[in-house]
């Protein structure tokens, strides 16, 4: 048994039970250790059931009984064949505990040893619950949509799908180092989740916005993009002048072909410098004048299509100018634009800081307003009460008598209502007690009938076993009868038996005749009869001794079984739990009386 207990304890440790090293047998298991072992095994076998049970034994007796009943019900649901109740967990005996833990250990999964370190973790329990839920869904048969019940329509239909409705999102575009995230609000923008009124459309809106950003990012590397001027301004200085001129000419031709290829009115374009000047008008007193590069760029983009085409053809002629002047003008213009952009960013950051400060001040002012409103309401109530008291002062005695009458009438009304409530409460309590008594009687009757049904099942099984055994004996006798020779007659056996009986009778008659004639023969016959009688007594004594020895062994086994059940320790635990339960009941009664 000790070797089997060690193997069982090793299985419990693999399932996640913290069994102390000094515990080597099930006899040393405490109530707390039994509850923890059963809960850990249930969590590994069925995470959906075990996750709702606590491995720690609560302090309150009512909570202990509820936990023990839940464990018993969970084990019975798994198919435990024996009787199981709360006493098997709170006051365990060694044989019952061994049967229960062996039953649970047999149902542990084969890979429990591999997941020994993670079997008691919340992540492992969650993964097992997800896997069991997926297996349950895969085990369900597929039903056509027109034949589905409402429950199947919810499980297998399209109830969890949402239509793809996207809304336009506006995100802050800041270039400073303290740039906010996409989900945060800008100085004049709401947060991204608040811009979508429907919660179901938030994911669709974010997906569409990110797809647009991805398309814009991948399209920037193509010829004819809008930022070709910025890329040409960042060309390395060591590159050949002819290659730079050819690349610039190619970009200009491609851009003009895309812009003026279709007939129609020319589009009006705003200069980047004008936009930045409009943003930075409040921060800078004067607007910087455009450089020669800016004016030439503006003039280039505002020409007619014929002039643009002519200018494209004249690019090789004008490209003979000194390249250094062009690069210097571009660098100067870029530097001025950077300064303006930094000024705009600085102004935006200052405005954001001011808005945050104003928001905090606004919250404080609103809080003070609410507090002042509450204080005003309280003062109005106190003023109203004092004004009513002042109105009653001129005729104080009469008003006091009226108030006394009102108080007495209110007290009488309360007493009357209490009497009416008592009239309604008494029959309801009587009916409740009657129904509770009927329920108890029904439960007793159902338990009695259940016991009778179980006894009938056992008797049916015993009768079936007896019938099966007799059927086997009958088949054996039939086979022996078939093996006997067919020519043997029953008459020969009967005659032989009659001859033996006749010989015995003759021998008795001869012995009686000899005993009458000879005294020695008579004494020998008497001694033989006494010897037969003593032998029968000796045989009876030996049989009684064997029966007593069997009873002694049975009693020893019962004593060992009772010692294994730890009856005395369980009785001590029951007494302690009874005292704790009485203390809890007394505390609850005291609270009820105080309430």
UniProtKB/Swiss-Prot annotation:
Q: Which residues, renumbered to this chain, carry the PTM Phosphoserine? A: 410
Family, according to the entry, reads as follows: Belongs to the CCDC22 family.
- Where do the segments described as Sufficicient and required for interaction with CCDC93 lie? 1-447
Q: Gene name on record?
A: CCDC22
Name the source organism.
Answer: Bos taurus
| Region annotated Sufficient for interaction with COMMD1, chain positions | 1-321
Molecular function (GO) terms for this protein are: cullin family protein binding
Q: Which residues form a coiled coil?
A: 323-369, 447-484, 564-595
Query: Which PANTHER family does its entry note?
Result: COILED-COIL DOMAIN-CONTAINING PROTEIN 22, JM1 PROTEIN
Stated name of the protein = Coiled-coil domain-containing protein 22
Q: Quote the subunit structure annotation.
A: Component of the commander complex consisting of the CCC subcomplex and the retriever subcomplex. Component of the CCC (COMMD/CCDC22/CCDC93) subcomplex consisting of COMMD1, COMMD2, COMMD3, COMMD4, COMMD5, COMMD6, COMMD7, COMMD8, COMMD9, COMMD10, CCDC22 and CCDC93. Forms a coiled-coil heterodimer with CCDC22; this heterodimer interacts with the guanine nucleotide exchange factor DENND10; the interaction is direct. Interacts with CUL1, CUL2, CUL3, SKP1, BTRC. Interacts with SNX17 and SNX31. Interacts with CPNE1 and CPNE4.
Name a GO CC annotation attached to this entry. Answer: endosome
Q: What is the lineage of its organism?
A: Eukaryota, Metazoa, Chordata, Craniata, Vertebrata
Query: Can the keyword Repressor be found in this entry's annotation?
Result: no
Q: Which UniProt keywords apply?
A: Coiled coil, Cytoplasm, Cytoskeleton, Endosome, Phosphoprotein, Protein transport, Transport, Ubl conjugation pathway
């Amino acid at each position: 048994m000790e070797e089997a207990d060690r193997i069982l304890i090793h299985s419990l440790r693999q399932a996640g039970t913290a069994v102390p090293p000094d515990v080597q047998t099930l006899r040393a298991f405490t109530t707390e250790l039994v509850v923890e072992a059963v809960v850990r095994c249930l969590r590994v076998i069925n995470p959906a059931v075990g996750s709702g049970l606590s491995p720690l034994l609560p302090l309150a007796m009512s909570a202990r009984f509820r936990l023990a009943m839940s464990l018993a019900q969970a084990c019975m649901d798994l198919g435990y064949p024996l009787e199981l109740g709360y006493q098997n967990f709170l006051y365990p005996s060694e044989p019952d505990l061994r049967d229960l833990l062996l039953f649970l250990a047999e149902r542990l999964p084969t890979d429990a040893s591999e997941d020994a370190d993670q079997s008691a973790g919340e992540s492992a329990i969650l993964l097992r619950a997800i896997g069991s839920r997926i297996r349950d869904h895969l085990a369900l048969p597929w039903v056509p949509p027109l034949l589905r019940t409402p429950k199947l329509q919810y499980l297998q239909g399209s109830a969890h799908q949402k239509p793809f409705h996207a809304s336009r999102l506006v995100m802050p575009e800041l270039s400073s180092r303290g740039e906010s995230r996409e989900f945060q609000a800008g100085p004049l923008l709401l947060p991204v989740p608040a811009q979508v009124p429907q919660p179901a459309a938030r994911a669709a809106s974010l997906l569409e916005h990110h797809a647009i950003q991805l398309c814009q990012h991948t399209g920037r590397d193509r010829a004819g993009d809008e930022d070709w001027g910025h890329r040409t301004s960042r060309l390395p200085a060591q590159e050949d002048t002819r290659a730079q001129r050819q690349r610039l000419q190619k970009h200009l031709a491609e851009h003009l072909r895309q812009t003026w290829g279709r007939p129609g009115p020319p589009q009006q374009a705003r200069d980047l410098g004008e936009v930045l000047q409009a943003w930075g008008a409040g921060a800078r007193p004067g607007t910087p004048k455009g450089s020669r590069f800016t004016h030439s760029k503006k003039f280039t983009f505002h020409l007619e299509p014929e002039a643009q085409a002519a200018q494209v053809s004249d690019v090789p002629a004008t490209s003979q100018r000194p390249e250094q002047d062009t690069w210097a003008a571009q660098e100067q213009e870029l530097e001025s634009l950077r300064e303006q952009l930094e000024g705009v960013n600085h102004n935006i950051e200052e405005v954001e800081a001011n808005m945050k400060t104003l928001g905090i001040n606004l919250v404080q002012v609103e809080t003070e307003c609410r507090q002042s409103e509450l204080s005003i309401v309280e003062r109005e109530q106190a003023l109203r009460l004092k004004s009513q008291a002042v109105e009653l002062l001129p005729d104080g005695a009469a008003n006091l008598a009226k108030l006394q009458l009102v108080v007495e009438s209110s007290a009488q009304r309360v007493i009357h209502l209490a009497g009416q409530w008592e009239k309604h409460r008494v029959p309801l309590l009587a009916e409740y007690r009657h129904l509770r008594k009927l329920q108890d009687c029904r439960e007793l009757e159902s338990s009695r009938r259940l016991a009778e049904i179980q006894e009938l099942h056992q008797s049916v099984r015993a009768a079936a076993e007896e019938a099966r055994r007799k059927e086997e004996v009958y088949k054996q006798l039939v086979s022996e009868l078939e093996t006997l020779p067919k020519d043997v007659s029953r008459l020969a056996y009967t005659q032989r038996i009659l001859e033996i009986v006749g010989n015995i009778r003759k021998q008795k008659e001869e012995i009686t005749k000899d005993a009458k004639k000879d005294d020695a023969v008579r004494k020998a016959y008497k001694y033989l009869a006494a010897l037969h009688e003593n032998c029968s007594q000796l045989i009876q004594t030996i049989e009684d001794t064997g029966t007593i020895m069997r009873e002694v062994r049975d009693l020893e086994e019962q004593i060992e079984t009772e010692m294994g059940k730890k009856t005395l320790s369980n009785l001590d635990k029951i007494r302690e739990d009874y005292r704790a339960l009485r203390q809890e009941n007394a505390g609850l009664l005291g609270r009820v009386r105080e309430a």
